[in-house]
């Protein structure tokens, strides 16, 4: 039982560890405007793209995909920034 708990805890820690930063982490260009690099969970098709994290540390977590998002016009109560995003390669 203790071995199983230790193995699960180790697997969770490895899965949550950050990966290499995407090229040009921080600022990017969307349709001629300066945008921000965000990390979205690609494992959940729709909800994962709506719940994107603005890249502050320079790395995305394992299982996340880097997107360049235009955040210039998002001033409402609900910011749907995934609609203004372009996937980075």
Swiss-Prot record:
<keyword id="KW-0968">Cytoplasmic vesicle</keyword>
<keyword id="KW-1015">Disulfide bond</keyword>
<feature type="signal peptide">
    <location>
        <begin position="1"/>
        <end position="16"/>
    </location>
</feature>
<comment type="function">
    <text>Aerial growth, conidiation, and dispersal of filamentous fungi in the environment rely upon a capability of their secreting small amphipathic proteins called hydrophobins (HPBs) with low sequence identity. Class I can self-assemble into an outermost layer of rodlet bundles on aerial cell surfaces, conferring cellular hydrophobicity that supports fungal growth, development and dispersal; whereas Class II form highly ordered films at water-air interfaces through intermolecular interactions but contribute nothing to the rodlet structure.</text>
</comment>
<keyword id="KW-0325">Glycoprotein</keyword>
<keyword id="KW-0964">Secreted</keyword>
<comment type="similarity">
    <text>Belongs to the fungal hydrophobin family.</text>
</comment>
<feature type="disulfide bond">
    <location>
        <begin position="28"/>
        <end position="68"/>
    </location>
</feature>
<feature type="disulfide bond">
    <location>
        <begin position="69"/>
        <end position="85"/>
    </location>
</feature>
<keyword id="KW-0926">Vacuole</keyword>
<keyword id="KW-0134">Cell wall</keyword>
<feature type="disulfide bond">
    <location>
        <begin position="39"/>
        <end position="60"/>
    </location>
</feature>
<feature type="disulfide bond">
    <location>
        <begin position="40"/>
        <end position="52"/>
    </location>
</feature>
<protein>
    <recommendedName>
        <fullName>Class I hydrophobin C</fullName>
    </recommendedName>
</protein>
<feature type="glycosylation site" description="N-linked (GlcNAc...) asparagine">
    <location>
        <position position="36"/>
    </location>
</feature>
<keyword id="KW-0732">Signal</keyword>
